[in-house]
Amino acid sequence: TVDHLLVFGSNGRVYTVPVANLPGARGDGQPITTLIDLDAGTQPLHYFAGAEAVTLLLSGSGGYGFLARIEHMLSRQRGGKAFITVGAGEQVCRPSVVALGSEPKSTPAPSGQAQAVISFAAATHVACASTGGRILTFEIGELKLMEKGGRGLTLIDLEPKDTLAGAAAYTRSVRIFGIGRGGKAREEQLE
């Protein structure tokens, strides 16, 4: 799997840096701005690294949002790809993982040691919080997967001076697989 580092700019553009192009850990490093061409006045706001099949919840402080896969945000251009439409005075909110795209793989534990694998199911709900202290949750199926980006749907109605503080995808349950007492396989569903 080839992972990509996505850089979300304050102008709504998404910049792609192949992880293999990042400097090694033993050097002095280099600023991310040497690997991408940011427009004048644009700041990198958020970063996300993952495989192409990962689905993210993208939102802006204006209260709009949508779902998108990393594969749709990729660009070979150093200037990035216009993907999230943000209005004047709005900011891009931190992306939230909806689905990893495939089940996590685990390696067997050495003999005599217990191993636990946590399976992350795709998110089932979205929680939105406004700067005015309001919270709204709804099922994630109400959102669109937008391959070309854009503004999206209204996530939460905002008061005139409020903004969207953030939106996060979550699941109401987690399934844990592991080795229990006596070396027997065990599975737990946490609601």
What is the predicted function of each stretch?
Residues 1-191:
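Short, structured "edge-of-domain" segments at secondary-structure transitions
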